[in-house]
UniProtKB/Swiss-Prot annotation:
Lipid bilayer topology: Multi-pass membrane protein
UniProt-recorded Gene Ontology molecular function terms: fluoride channel activity; metal ion binding
Protein name: Fluoride-specific ion channel FluC 1
Keywords: Cell membrane, Ion channel, Ion transport, Membrane, Metal-binding, Sodium, Transmembrane, Transmembrane helix, Transport
Amino acid sequence: MKLVYTYVAVALGGALGGAFRFILTIIFPFHNWPWGIFTANLGGCFLLGFLTPILQLKKSIPLAVKKGITVGLIGGFTTMSTFAADTIAMLQNGHLLGGSVYLLATVTGGMGFVALGFVLGARGRTR
């Protein structure tokens, strides 16, 4: 049953995080630079880095609440924060090669798959 609460907390947090990210894109519209998304990515990275060690020490806070904040709210606000936190965790745990490969593979792979998606999506529009 506790897992159900965690799912609900993550879903609600994700909805709020996504809504907050959308609000930032309205406040800071794209004019030569995606300020809203840039702010969400860097702000979310800071928030996840700041809150994770605090939440780990707070044993009185239920796991569902912790996951709702980190995976849900901040993850919904920006997936960049989770990627950055996972990379840092790998490096801190001595997995220098794995962390470095994960970093490079995620960035280059992400860019490559976005480009592939654009190409395939454009083909579908011209047929």
